[in-house]
């Protein structure tokens, strides 16, 4: 297993419980989408898998290691094997895009190479290749504060693609993108995960994107798993129940009606990592 959570819970110092009794596992190369209303615990779940949150109860294993039972040095080594795409990528505003992407390997390269790359980028071609996959190659030498929110998100994805981690986690990676770029970006994440047989876990606001690109859907509600099902078994009724606390229908990226979301899930995945023309 690439990761396993057994009855894992997370409680904060103020007593608020973010996750409750989460049992979840993924095998090598398995893509999983996590959906649910705001405050359901999606980000907390990803942070738990990234080993940036420690469980208050239960057991966590990531890449065949127990993060909280190893030394600080081994924990740092484990974290270098995990790639995290943030909704708002943590990049210094004045940092160049090329440097931001190469930072994906700072924990892997020798210290001297990491330090030198901050001044003289060590692999300009490699960074450019990842940007080109996301149609952003022309911004390689721009500063991060010159980019839009969606462009910054693509830089964050490019950094993880360049890192080549053994576990890819993505927290709302396309929330600032239009439907065309969102599909392009998720397609590249899927392609990377499929090609290298590494697990990909992404939290997504848009239900239609989750069903389009991921064969397994985990629904979170109030910090608990509401369902864990193949995409083709996620029905409109399940989605309405999951989002019952929100005033609107389950959120979608485009104009697709809720009644057509689950019906098209099986055809959208089927091993093909190209989006259907209707969404482009």
From Swiss-Prot:
Subcellular compartments: Cell inner membrane
Gene3D superfamilies: P-loop containing nucleotide triphosphate hydrolases
Binding site residues for ATP: 36-43
SUPFAM superfamilies named among the record's database cross-references: P-loop containing nucleoside triphosphate hydrolases (SSF52540)
Entry keyword Nucleotide-binding: yes
UniProtKB keywords: ATP-binding, Cell inner membrane, Cell membrane, Membrane, Nucleotide-binding, Phosphonate transport, Translocase, Transport
Membrane topology: Peripheral membrane protein
Residues in ABC transporter domain copies: 3-247
Pfam families: ABC_tran
Known catalytic reactions: phosphonate(out) + ATP + H2O = phosphonate(in) + ADP + phosphate + H(+)
GO cellular component terms, A-Z: plasma membrane
Biological function: Part of the ABC transporter complex PhnCDE involved in phosphonates import. Responsible for energy coupling to the transport system.
Protein name: Phosphonates import ATP-binding protein PhnC 1
Species of origin: Cupriavidus necator (strain ATCC 17699 / DSM 428 / KCTC 22496 / NCIMB 10442 / H16 / Stanier 337)
């Amino acid at each position: 297993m690439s990761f396993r959570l057994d009855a894992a819970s997370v409680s904060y110092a103020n007593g608020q419980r973010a996750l409750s009794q989460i049992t979840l596992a993924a095998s090598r190369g398995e893509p999983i989408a996590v959906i649910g209303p705001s405050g359901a615990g999606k980000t907390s779940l990803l942070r738990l898998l990234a080993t940036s949150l420690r469980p208050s109860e239960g057991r966590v294993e990531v890449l065949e290691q127990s993060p909280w039972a190893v030394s600080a040095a081994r924990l740092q080594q484990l974290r270098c094997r995990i790639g995290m795409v943030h909704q708002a990528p943590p990049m210094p505003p004045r940092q160049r895009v090329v440097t931001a992407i190469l930072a994906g390997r700072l924990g892997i390269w020798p210290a001297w190479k990491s330090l030198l790359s901050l001044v003289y980028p060590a692999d300009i071609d490699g960074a450019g290749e990842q940007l080109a996959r996301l149609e952003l190659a022309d911004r390689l030498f721009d500063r991060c504060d010159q980019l839009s929110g969606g462009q910054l998100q693509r830089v964050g994805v490019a950094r993880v693609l360049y890192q080549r981690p053994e576990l890819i986690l993505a927290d709302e990676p396309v929330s600032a993108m239009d439907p065309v770029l969102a599909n392009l970006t998720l397609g590249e994440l899927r392609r990377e995960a499929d090609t290298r047989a590494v697990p990909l876990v992404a939290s997504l606001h848009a239900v239609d994107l989750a069903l389009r690109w991921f064969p397994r859907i985990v629904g979170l509600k109030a910090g608990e798993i509401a369902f864990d099902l193949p995409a083709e078994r996620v029905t409109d009724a399940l989605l309405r129940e999951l989002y019952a606390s929100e005033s609107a229908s389950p959120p979608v990226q485009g104009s697709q009606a809720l009644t057509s979301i689950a019906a098209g899930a099986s055809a959208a995945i089927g091993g093909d990592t190209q989006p259907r023309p209707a969404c482009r």
